[in-house]
Amino acid sequence: MSRIWAVARHTIAECIRTRIAVVFIVVMAAILLSLPFSVAGDGVTLKSRVQSYLSYSLGLVAFLLSLLTVFLSCSTLASEIRLRQIFMIACKPIPRWQFFAGKWLGIVAMDAGLLLASGAMVWGATWYLQTRPTYDEDRKALDAEVLTVRHGVKIGVPDFNPMVDERIRKLREEGRLNDMSLSGRRTIRDDIQEELRTGWRMLKPGEYKDYTFGHLLVDREDPKVWLQLHFKPRSSAGVEDVIFKARWQCGDRDDVNTLMPVQEGEFIVNRFHEVPVPAAAVNKEGVLRLRIQNITDHDTIVFEGSDSFEALYGIGTFHWNLFRALSIIWCRLAFLTALGLAASTFLSFPVAAMVTFLILMVATASGFLSEAIAGAAPAGTAPDPMWFLGPVLRPLASVFVMLVPDFSKFDPVGNVVGGRVVPLLWVIDSMVRLVLIQGLILGLLGAAVFTKRELAQVTV
């Protein structure tokens, strides 16, 4: 272990001496320190200003450190091989796999230090912005919706199976299922289920619905504890900028102590909105009941998607949420380090950097690429939009995207900006999947190639 750590210390010193590393560090520090004075958000609320700063700063840290990691991991081995400096190491009594592991440890240790320093600057700048003067409602929104950690509970979905069975029974009695195959009947059942689910999430003009949010772990007796109803209404006609007028009341009608006053409000469709609710509206079973009515004259409103209507409640503090987000970013950097080092064992620096950048871009856009590949498939008997290349390229692209880790699976920056919890499960998943499995596999392959290769061999 002492040999690995010696190589790691040498790698850190080498990275600090590298001009490109210093440039990245200076640029990142300058931007992080200047952003608090330049971001404006929506130009009205301090909440929006803090959210804009967190989004830009954390996104910038992840982007710049990813670039720095790719450059350092692809250049440290490749440059030593190209400049023949590796021969001085090869003659020493240290196995090549330990040399490879020391390189990885040095780069990820430097990344960890830079992440901690960046996190401290982000936290300090956020604290500075928090102290800026603003009006009371904006201050409350900042504390309750950004500088906190909230867990989201989705609407409790009722059991539609009895209603589906009744509809199927009527169709069978009418003889409309007699000549239909088993798969066709299954499709009919799924369509009915989706129709009922959509209707349950739909509010016609003048119509009201009762929704419930269960398992809310809040202190009902504390008047300072509040929840937020987080929702995104949509117009069933797909029209933008429609004003949704709603009337709602929170509380359990079987427990008058939980009933809150009736409220009304206007909300623009296709945008997320948050409405504060006192914790006293939650009943003894930890359930929040909501009755909401559409008082818009003509428009039908739909809450589409699993995240279109949630109840949020606080469970922690901002700084630990920030630390978890930085931990996930570090796991991604550790994977990129292993990838860059493995590529540089048999490729020259430009080619290794190009390959690593390609995988970084695919990993970042993995979710979008998967949807794009699926969308490029022909529908039914329609001609293939990719002509004769489609049957060949789509499977290859699907396999490539499947092999590359999906960085878009988790959004730690978005959760920090929205005051949402960065789950510990995300951190564990990133650590296991990116570092202990995929990173370890790349490290073993890279160490094996580096051990077997002829150092004097020319790489391209």
Regions found by a protein language model. Give the residues of each.
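Central hydrophobic cores of alpha-helical transmembrane segments
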Residues: 24-30, 352-363
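Selective transmembrane-helix segments that form parts of the transport pathway or gating/packing helices
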Residues: 24, 64-65, 96-123, 338
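Short cytosolic juxtamembrane segments of multi-pass membrane proteins
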Residues: 452-460
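Long, hydrophobic alpha-helical segments
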Residues: 57-79, 114
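Helix-loop-helix units of permease transmembrane domains in multi-pass membrane transporters
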Residues: 75-106, 330, 450
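Aromatic- and glycine-rich beta-strand/loop motifs that create alpha-glucan
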Residues: 1-22
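Terminal transmembrane helical anchor/hairpin motif
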Residues: 38-47, 124, 129-315, 362-447
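Short, membrane-interfacial amphipathic segments enriched in basic
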Residues: 1-6, 43, 312-316, 320, ...
